Regions:
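Alpha/beta-hydrolase fold catalytic core
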Residues: 1-82, 107-108, 148, 326-328
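Conserved alpha/beta-hydrolase catalytic His-Asp/Glu region
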Residues: 45-47, 54, 187-193, 203-263
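Active-site loop/oxyanion-hole signature of alpha/beta-hydrolase fold enzymes
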Residues: 68-69, 74-78, 112-153
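Conserved HGGG/HGGXW glycine-rich cap/lid loop of the alpha/beta-hydrolase fold
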Residues: 76-120
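Flexible "cap/lid" loop of the alpha/beta hydrolase fold
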Residues: 163, 167, 174-205
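Short beta-strand/loop motif that positions the catalytic acidic residue
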Residues: 264, 270-272, 276
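Conserved alpha/beta-hydrolase "acid-adjacent" motif
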Residues: 277-283
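Catalytic active-site module of serine/aspartate enzymes centered on a nucleophile-bearing elbow/loop
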Residues: 294-328
Length: 328
C-alpha cells in the first residue's frame, strides 16, 4: 500500500481540484504560446489570415466565393439593411474595409469583394485589368449576386472602377462614394514625383521598400510585426510582374474618372484625407467641378490620415458613409 502524503490528507478536496485545474490551464497556455510563437516564426501568413477572419466575424461578415465569367470572386457579405458595395484600391484587398465594416454592418447589408486579380479572387494570366475591364467584371458580379439597387463606394483605383460602372449602369446605383479617388486632374503628389523619377513604390522586395510605401499611404504608418511585413514582401515579390503590368495600364489612364464625371447622375460623395500623398487633395476640386449632372454632391475631408481613411480613421469614415447613405 502506497504511503499517503500529508498534503493529500490535509488539503481540502476543492483545493486539490483547483490546483489540478490550474496546472492543466497552465499547460494549455504554454502549449498555445508555443503554437502561436511557432506560427509567427514559420507561418505568419496563417496568423494574419486568422486575424482578418476574426475581424470579419466580429463585423458579422461571412466569406463567400462565386465563379462569374473568367473570375472566381472572393467576397465578404453580411449585415442587414440597404446594400452597400465596397471596392478596394490598387494592390489592395477586401480586408482593408474590415474596420469600417464593423461599424456599418449593424445598419447595412455589405458586399465587399476582392477585385479580380487581387486578394483571394482569381487572376487570368496576361488578362486585362484596366478600368473598363474591371467595370465590366463588376457588372457581371453584381448580376450574378442579383443585388438590388445599392450604394457603391470605391477607394483609389476602386473609385475609378465604381464610377465607370455607375456611369454605365446608373439605374443600379443609388449613390456613389469616391474615397481618395484615382483618375482626376490633380496637383503633383509624392507618388507621381517618385514614378516620374523611375521609382514605383508599389514594387518592393524587402522591409525597407514596404516602409517606403507605408510612409506614402499612411499619415501614421501602422507598427506591423516584422514577420507580417515579410508576408507582404513575399506576396509583392510573387505578384511583381502583375503589379507592374497593371500599374502601367492604369498609369496610361490618368483621367479614367475625370472623363466620366459628366455622366454620373446619382448623388455623389467625394471623401479625401487631407494629407494624401498618393493622390493630391486638389483632385477634390476637379471632382466637384466636373459633376455637372449629379443629382446631389457632397464632399468631406478628414484630417490626420494619408491615402487610407478606412484604416486610419474608420470611425469618421463610417460616420460620413452612413450619413451619405441614409440621406439618399
Amino acid at each position: 500500500m502506497s504511503p499517503t502524503s500529508p498534503t493529500d490528507t490535509t488539503t481540502p478536496l476543492w483545493k486539490r481540484m483547483l490546483r489540478r485545474r490550474l496546472k492543466f490551464l497552465a499547460w494549455r497556455v504554454a502549449l498555445l504560446a508555443i503554437v502561436l510563437g511557432g506560427s509567427y516564426l514559420f507561418a505568419p501568413q496563417w496568423l494574419m489570415r486568422a486575424g482578418h477572419l476574426r475581424e470579419a466575424m466580429a463585423a458579422k461578415l461571412e466569406t463567400h466565393s462565386v465563379q462569374v465569367g473568367d473570375t472566381r470572386w472572393s467576397y465578404y457579405e453580411g449585415g442587414e439593411g440597404p446594400t452597400i458595395v465596397l471596392l478596394h484600391g490598387f494592390a489592395g484587398d477586401k480586408d482593408v474595409w474590415l474596420p469600417v465594416a464593423a461599424l456599418l454592418s449593424a445598419h447595412f447589408h455589405l458586399v465587399i469583394p476582392d477585385l479580380p486579380g487581387w486578394g483571394e479572387s482569381s487572376r487570368v494570366a496576361q488578362g486585362n485589368y484596366d478600368v473598363d475591364a474591371q467595370a465590366a467584371r463588376l457588372d457581371a458580379f453584381v448580376q450574378a449576386l442579383r443585388l438590388p439597387r445599392f450604394m457603391l463606394a470605391g477607394h483609389g483605383t476602386g473609385a475609378a472602377i465604381a464610377a465607370a460602372y455607375a456611369a454605365d449602369q446608373p439605374q443600379r446605383v443609388a449613390g456613389l462614394a469616391l474615397l481618395d479617388a484615382y483618375g482626376l486632374k490633380a496637383g503633383e503628389s509624392d507618388l507621381t514625383r517618385l514614378v516620374r523619377a523611375g521609382n514605383n513604390p508599389y514594387l518592393f522586395g524587402d522591409r525597407a521598400g514596404y516602409a517606403q510605401l507605408a510612409a506614402l499611404e499612411f499619415a501614421q504608418p501602422p507598427d506591423r510585426p516584422g514577420r507580417f511585413v515579410d508576408v507582404l514582401v513575399e506576396r509583392n515579390r510573387r505578384d511583381r510582374d502583375f503589379i507592374q503590368r497593371t500599374f502601367q495600364a492604369w498609369h496610361a489612364q490618368p483621367l479614367a474618372l475625370q472623363q466620366r464625371l459628366g455622366r454620373l447622375t446619382m448623388p455623389v460623395l467625394g471623401l479625401w484625407c487631407h494629407d494624401d500623398r498618393i493622390t493630391d487633395i486638389s483632385a477634390l476640386d476637379s471632382l466637384r467641378n466636373g459633376l455637372t449632372a449629379a443629382s446631389a454632391i457632397s464632399t468631406s475631408t478628414i484630417n490626420g490620415c494619408g491615402h487610407l481613411p478606412m484604416l486610419e480613421k474608420p470611425e469618421t469614415t463610417a460616420q460620413i458613409l452612413t450619413g451619405f447613405a441614409l440621406s439618399h
